[in-house]
Amino acid sequence: MTLANATHTSAIDIARFGKVAVMFGGRSAEREVSLRSGQAVLSALISAGVNAHGFDPAESELHQLVEQKFDRVLIMLHGRGGEDGSLQGALQQMNMPYTGTGVLGSALCMDKIRSKQVWQSLGLPTANYEIADKRDFNAANCSDIMSRLGDLVMVKPAQEGSSIGMAKVSNAQQLAAAIQQAFEYDDKVLLEQFIQGSEYTVSLLNGEAMPSISMSTPRDFYDYEAKYQSNTTEYFCPSGLPAEQEGLLARLALDAFDAVAGSGWGRVDFMQDMLGQFYLLEANTVPGMTEKSLVPLAAKQAGLSFEQLSLAVLATAG
């Protein structure tokens, strides 16, 4: 379903979706965000006339999808167990159609290190980085890491979303502490050169890019609180980029998503440095769909209501 077709909900055969499980909640660190996303999408689908029901895998076993005669699954699970390919593989084995990216792409996009390695191998722009491994990490090396990556470094657990476990550091002592904290979430941690500049995100639907969004926060960086709790975070859509840069960003988002086997729908995040160069941060295969989320904002600018967007996401299920 293209963006243009998604605006014509009257042309959608709602009955063809059958009985739909909107899967949300789960056991990851992003459970609360997933609950909010899933409940919003569930309400929208029911409003559109879809036979949709909530399904929390933290409370129900997957085999109940078959026993309760569901026809397809709309995945609204964020983080581990929802975005990392494990759920996608299980559903595939059950011959249960599901929304969004498949097993390989989900696993790649969930792993910030692997996705950066793929982009780097293809010549796509991404910030300089190093990897901290819990098995052999030595805090004595932090001064050298800072000297190689620059004055400011972002510390990110390799497989967490919503900025959970992330930190921005400016010296070796802070770096060592931030890495130890990140190890509570993952055995591997991405240490990334901080790009001073503006943050952008591009939402994608079936091979098309929606208008980009720029974000502004008075906080140190766009962290969990800035994303979900703060009232001072500002979002601009359209982002204000000149048409040429908007087109460049859209093409880069599509290329990056394709490179890591993303499909259906998703979101790609960027930084733009003071010289205008864009750098890939990460790709999201199950972006948030809360009242503060970015994909619904971009979709609205593209002419899609939340209900139309939810139907378009559902339509990505094979």
Curated annotation (Swiss-Prot):
* One biological process term in Gene Ontology: cell wall organization
Sorted alphabetically, which Pfam families does this protein's record hold?
Answer: Dala_Dala_lig_C, Dala_Dala_lig_N
Instruction: Please list the residues that bind Mg(2+) 2.
Output: 282, 284
| Catalytic activity entry | 2 D-alanine + ATP = D-alanyl-D-alanine + ADP + phosphate + H(+)
InterPro entries linked: ATP-grasp, ATP_grasp_subdomain_1, D-Ala_lig_Van_CS, D_ala_D_ala, Dala_Dala_lig_C, Dala_Dala_lig_N, PreATP-grasp_dom_sf
Q: Annotated Gene Ontology MF terms?
A: ATP binding; D-alanine-D-alanine ligase activity; metal ion binding
NCBIfam families named among the record's database cross-references: D_ala_D_alaTIGR (TIGR01205), PRK01372.1 (NF002378)
Similarity field: Belongs to the D-alanine--D-alanine ligase family.
Q: What does this protein do?
A: Cell wall formation.
Q: What is this protein called?
A: D-alanine--D-alanine ligase
